[in-house]
Amino acid sequence: MSAIQGIQGVISQLQATAMSARAQEPMPQPTISFAGQLHAALDRISDTQNTARVQAEKFTLGEPGVALNDVMTDMQKASVSMQMGIQVRNKLVAAYQEVMSMQV
């Protein structure tokens, strides 16, 4: 009998928690524009490119603490991010051309 009462107590606590969660007003979501996200992505690509360039310059000048594998990793990250940016651009251009060719 006490086990059933214990389960009922847990159920009532869960129901109270669910009711209080429903009573809370949802947090307003920040407005995120497509142009803003695109600009942020381009900034990240630019930052990756700049980081790779700086690492390569440091390695070329022989600064201590800059290993070849770090330079190569940064260069590959920059290359992959640039290729991704190019592919996104290509898809956006194709989508734009498709929308513009639609008849209204």
Curated annotation (Swiss-Prot):
InterPro entries cross-referenced by the UniProt entry: FliE
Origin superkingdom: Bacteria
Protein family: Belongs to the FliE family.
A GO CC term assigned to this protein in UniProt: bacterial-type flagellum basal body
Name of the molecule in the record: Flagellar hook-basal body complex protein FliE
Pfam families noted in UniProt: FliE
Alphabetized HAMAP family for the sequence: FliE
Biological process according to GO: bacterial-type flagellum-dependent cell motility
Subcellular localization: Bacterial flagellum basal body
UniProt entry tagged with the keyword Nucleus: no
Keywords, in A-Z order: Bacterial flagellum
GO molecular function: cytoskeletal motor activity; structural molecule activity
NCBIfam families in the record: fliE
